[in-house]
Amino acid sequence: MSRDITKDIYGDLNYAPITLFGNKLNVGIIGAGRGALIKTRNFYNKGSNIEVLALEFLDDFYELDTNRVKLIKGCYKTQFIKNKHIIIIAVSESELINKIKLDCENHHKIYINSAKFNEGMGVIPVSRESKYISAAINTKVGNPRGAVLVANLITEYIFELDEFIKLSGEIRNNLKFEEKTKDSLLKFINSKDFKFFYDKNKIINVLKLFYDDN
């Protein structure tokens, strides 16, 4: 009898998506290997304040702005997590990982376990951005390279939609209708039909249908 072994391996991964403002985050990263560097750069590029704790650092860490990335040489102590919003566990020693996890749970910290992602509280998605759109991609089978593939495939489409999203956002922010008409118009300007008229350069004519004759 066949069965879906992915359920045994990954369990039921029920993501609860939330988008945080990177420049308001204090992030603690424990470990300074290649994986830690990748995650440091990810938060660095989003403007986060970062502290990295390790006994040794890759040379690449020293290329980052020291005003935003503080490198701390030393062993882990509970005090390290107390002023952080998110903790990245990027070490391989099981005993240390369990100690950090317990501290994070006791202090209500969001933590990511790089060694075994499903034993943490979440994962860092693959993100792609245009000027007006931000997208984050996860897989539900622990396949980060697969997430990169999907993100790359949709990137071109994101850029194609960029100016359309800008326009629909500007219209939304300048609507002066009563609530019922406004709601109806908002549904329309964020529909495939409206995108069709946008592509045909007929937006002005269509929008006039929502105004009085004057």
Task: Show the residue positions of the predicted features.
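Glycine-rich adenosine-cofactor-binding loop
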Residues: 15-44, 52, 167-182, 190-193
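An accessory alpha-helical subdomain
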Residues: 139-214
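E1/E1-like adenylate-forming module used to activate ubiquitin-like modifiers
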Residues: 108, 112-162
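A short, basic/flexible loop-to-alpha-helix module at the beginning of a structural domain
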Residues: 3-22, 125
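NAD(P)-binding Rossmann-fold cofactor-contacting core
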Residues: 38, 46-63
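Conserved SAM/SAH-binding loop
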Residues: 74-78
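Short beta-strand and adjoining strand-loop segment in the mid-core
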Residues: 47-51, 84-94, 133-142
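ADP-ribose/adenylate-binding Rossmann-like module
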Residues: 86-91, 97-123
